[in-house]
Amino acid sequence: MVPAMDLDDVDRAIIAALLSDARASQRHLSREVGVAQGTITNRIRRMEEMGIIQGYSVVIDPESVGWNMTIMAGLMIAKGKMIDVQQKIAADPRVFSVYDVTGDWDSIVLARVKNRADLDDLTKNVFTLYGVTRSFTHVVLN
């Protein structure tokens, strides 16, 4: 585990700017943050090496590509099957997060489905994998 790194105002400003637009050029970041371009280059490189910045990604609007419903499912998983079940569920392209949790459920799954038929398929074919002993599914309203 990497020790925690103290971030100063410049680091935080760079991170905020990248969160707003990960494609921003270093020249643009330099103007926005108010420091030299070399400072931006060095700070970004250091934060990448320290694991603070772990990558850059595209964020899409799920509804614009047909994923109209977000669901949350709680799963009870048989002892000794947790990792295997979670890996199989995470491999489904509709699933975007799988969490270990405390409480009544062993795992919480977040997924996006196209419609009710797709939700029915996910529920019947993924949330009933060998090792899942019980599940509940909720449609996210907002």
Model segments located where?
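A compositional/biophysical signature of low hydrophobicity enriched in polar/charged and small residues
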Residues: 1-142
